[in-house]
Design a protein with these regions (language model features):
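Terminal accessory regions of large proteins
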Residues: 286-288, 293-466
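Conserved S-adenosyl-L-methionine
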Residues: 1-83, 91-95, 102-106, 119, ...
Length: 466
C-alpha cells in the first residue's frame, strides 16, 4: 500500500461523520520504502499521528494482532475493523505449511501455494467486524479456478459472505495489464444473492492505460448500493443459480455486456431508404419527443422510410422538442441561487467533504423525469469543476476570507541558454481568475479591448497583403 486506498476510504467515511479525527488508519506493508511512503502520505494529508498504526511486515506470515511492540505477549488482542480495503499482489506464491489451524483460514480453507489471492482475502476478512464491509482487488481467476480456490469460494458463498463482484476495465493499474475485479464481502448479510456487475466498458484512454472516470465510479457505487438489475451492466444472482453453475462466478456467465451485432439491410443498400428497424432502435427519442418521428420520415409503400428535407429545422421547431427544452429549463430554475447559498454564502463554514454529494443529489433530483440525459455524464461535469471548487473552499477556510482578494506571481517555464527556467509573467488571482473579475465588473471595457484587438488583427492582416 502507499496510503491511497486508506485515504480514499477515510474521505468516504468522513462524509458521514462530524469528526474525521474519529477515523483510525491501520496498514501493513512488506516493502520498507512503500511502508515509509504510506506513513508519509497519511501525515501529509492531515491525518493525526495518533490515528496512524502501520507495520512493516509480511501479512501472510505475521498476522495483525493488536499489541504493544514492547510487550507483544501480554498485550495481544485481535484487531477488528469497520472497513477493510486491499489491493494485494496478484497470484503471489506463499507457504501454507502449518497454517491449517490459523484462525484466518480454518473456516474456509488454505489457498494453494502457487496463488495467495485467497490467503490475502481471508486475512482481510478475518479482521472485519460483524457489521463491517470489505473490498479487495483481485485477478479474474479467483472467480472460476478450481481446486483449493474452488473450495474456499464455495465456502464463502454457502456462508453467505460474497456481497458483490465488480468487473473492472482492463489495464487500469500502472505496471500490470492483468484484468481485475473488486470483490465486496460482509460478515453478516440479510440476503443470500450476489450482485454481479460488469463495469469493464466504462473508461477512457489515458496514455497507455485505461482510466475510470468519476462518473464511471459513481455509476458502480449507485448500482451496488441499490443492488440494482441494469441491462448489460448488473444482475442479482441467486445462490441457487450459483450452485447450479458449480460455484463458478465468472462474470460473463451472469451478465452479457456485449454490444448488439451490427446488421446491414441489403435492400436499403441497393435501392435506398431507411429500414424501419433502424428507426425503431431510436425508440427512447420517439418516446421523449411524441410526434417527431412522423414529422421526420415519409414511409414508402415498400415499408422503407425517407428522411424529409431540412431535418434540423424540423427537430428544432417541433413542439415536443420545445416542450422538452422548457421542462429542462424549469427543472434547473433556482439552481444558481442554490449554488450561491451553498458555496458562496457559506464558503467559510461549508463541509467540503460532504458538499459534492449534496450537489449531486440536487442535480439528480432535478433530472428525475427528464429523459435522455445521462445523470452520470452530468455528475462527471460536476466532479471536474468540483476538483477546483473544493480546493478553493479549503484555501478560504484555511487562510481566511481575504485570500479571495489575494494575487500571486504567474510563473511560467521558459528556455534560457538552452535550459528550462521558471520566470514570472505577470500576476494571477489566487482564488478568482482575472478574466472573471474583468467580465463581471468591467464588461464594457472588456468589450472595447476585444474590439480594438480585433481591429489590430485585421490591420495586421491587411498589411501582410500589401
Amino acid at each position: 500500500v502507499s496510503g491511497s486506498l486508506l485515504l480514499n476510504i477515510g474521505e468516504a467515511l468522513a462524509r458521514h461523520i462530524d469528526d474525521p479525527d474519529r477515523i483510525k488508519y491501520y496498514a501493513q506493508e512488506l516493502k520498507q520504502n512503500t511502508y515509509n511512503l504510506t506513513r508519509m502520505n497519511l501525515v501529509m494529508r492531515g491525518i493525526k499521528p495518533d490515528n496512524i498504526v502501520t507495520r512493516n511486515a509480511d501479512t501472510l506470515e505475521d498476522d495483525w494482532p493488536y499489541f504493544e511492540d514492547n510487550d507483544p505477549e501480554n498485550t495481544y488482542e485481535p484487531l477488528y475493523l469497520d472497513a477493510v480495503v486491499s489491493n494485494p499482489p496478484y497470484s503471489q506464491k506463499w507457504d501454507p505449511t502449518g497454517k491449517e489451524s490459523d484462525p484466518r483460514y480454518a473456516r474456509f480453507g488454505l489457498a494453494p501455494k502457487s496463488k495467495a489471492d485467497y490467503a490475502f482475502l481471508l486475512h482481510d476478512f478475518y479482521h472485519l467486524k460483524p457489521d463491517g464491509i470489505m473490498t479487495i482487488v483481485l485477478p479474474h481467476g479467483v472467480l472460476f479456478r478450481g481446486g483449493e480456490e474452488g473450495t474456499i469460494r464455495r465456502n464463502l458463498i454457502e456462508n453467505n459472505h460474497i456481497d458483490a463482484i465488480i468487473g473492472l476495465p482492463p489495464n487500469i493499474f500502472f505496471g500490470t495489464g492483468i484484468p481485475t475485479i473488486i470483490m465486496v464481502l460482509k460478515q453478516k448479510r440479510d440476503s443470500t444473492d450476489t450482485l454481479i456487475v460488469d463495469a469493464s466498458k466504462g473508461f477512457v484512454k489515458s496514455g497507455k492505460n485505461n482510466m475510470l472516470r468519476a462518473g464511471d465510479i459513481r455509476r458502480i457505487v449507485d448500482v451496488v448500493a441499490a443492488r440494482a438489475d441494469v441491462e448489460k451492466y448488473s444482475r442479482l444472482v441467486s445462490r441457487d443459480e450459483i450452485r447450479e453453475n458449480d460455484y463458478n462466478l465468472n462474470i460473463p456467465r451472469y451478465v452479457d455486456s456485449s454490444e448488439d451485432p451490427e446488421t446491414w439491410d441489403i435492400y436499403a443498400s441497393m435501392f435506398g431508404g431507411i429500414p424501419a428497424n433502424e428507426i425503431d432502435a431510436l425508440s427512447p427519442y420517439w418516446e421523449a419527443f411524441p410526434g417527431l418521428r412522423g414529422e421526420l420520415f415519409d414511409v414508402q409503400p415498400n415499408g422503407y422510410a425517407q428522411c424529409k428535407d431540412d431535418p434540423a429545422a424540423i427537430v428544432n421547431g417541433h413542439a415536443s422538442v420545445l416542450e422538452f427544452e422548457e421542462n429542462y429549463r424549469r427543472a434547473f430554475d433556482g439552481f444558481g441561487d442554490f449554488l450561491h447559498e451553498h458555496l458562496v454564502s457559506r464558503c467559510e463554514t461549508v463541509k467540503v467533504s460532504r458538499e459534492e454529494n449534496l450537489l449531486t443529489q440536487d442535480i439528480f433530483t432535478r433530472l428525475d423525469g427528464i429523459p435522455l440525459v445521462d445523470r452520470y455524464a452530468a455528475f462527471q461535469m460536476l466532479h471536474e469543476q468540483w476538483t477546483t471548487v473544493s480546493l478553493d473552499l479549503e484555501m478560504i477556510q484555511r487562510e481566511g476570507f481575504d485570500t479571495i482578494r489575494a494575487i500571486d506571481p504567474h510563473m511560467v517555464v521558459k528556455k534560457k541558454n538552452g535550459k528550462d527556467q521558471e520566470v514570472q509573467e505577470g500576476w494571477e488571482g489566487r482564488i478568482i481568475p482575472f478574466d472573471i473579475v474583468q467580465k463581471t465588473l468591467m464588461p464594457e471595457q472588456v468589450k472595447a479591448v476585444a474590439e480594438l484587438e480585433e481591429r489590430l488583427e485585421q490591420a495586421q492582416f491587411e498589411l501582410t497583403d500589401l
